[in-house]
Amino acid sequence: MSYCRQEGKDKIIFVTKEDHETPSSAELIADDPNDPFEEQGLILPNGDINWNCPCLGGMASGPCGEQFKSAFSCFHYSQEEIKGSDCLDQFRAMQECMQKYPELYPQEDDEDELEKEKQNKDEESSVTQSSDTKEESSS
């Protein structure tokens, strides 16, 4: 016996083997590209950039959002042979802005450095503890 159960936002449908053997009669409805509530990708059907795309990770908002939009737009619409080579000023402005907010825009080098420092402290701590243990056992 097949049935459906709602759990919060999820709808769970239990079906039998017989249900799977019967061809589906469901009709698919084509997505409306003009539906403002329909999730879109990075590039909208009209070719514009979708600044609300979760794939941008919020970069289009925040203190450097305008600089990001300027640099990203320049790159996206660039017609240069080396795409984006005409956007250096915009990317430089974005980078300068991001350096003003290191807590919001950590650089990979900074993250690597912090991780290495943490590992070094952990290693120093374990070396100190093991040498203390050796001194106690030898006395």
UniProtKB/Swiss-Prot annotation:
GO terms for biological process: mitochondrial disulfide relay system; protein import into mitochondrial intermembrane space. Residues 61-105 form the CHCH domain. Keywords: Disulfide bond, Mitochondrion, Oxidoreductase, Protein transport, Redox-active center, Translocation, Transport. GO terms for molecular function: protein-disulfide reductase activity. Its main location: mitochondrion. GO terms for cellular component: mitochondrial intermembrane space. A motif (Cx9C motif 2) lies at residues 87-97. Signal peptide: none annotated. Disulfide bonds join C53-C55, C64-C97, C74-C87. Residues 102-139 are annotated as: Disordered. It is found in: Mitochondrion intermembrane space. A motif (Cx9C motif 1) lies at residues 64-74. Residues 115-124 have a biased composition (Basic and acidic residues). Central component of a redox-sensitive mitochondrial intermembrane space import machinery which is required for the biogenesis of respiratory chain complexes. Functions as chaperone and catalyzes the formation of disulfide bonds in substrate proteins, such as COX17 or MICU1. Required for the import and folding of small cysteine-containing proteins (small Tim) in the mitochondrial intermembrane space (IMS). Precursor proteins to be imported into the IMS are translocated in their reduced form into the mitochondria. Monomer. Can form homooligomers. The CHCH domain contains a conserved twin Cys-X(9)-Cys motif which is required for import and stability of MIA40 in mitochondria. This is Mitochondrial intermembrane space import and assembly protein 40-B.
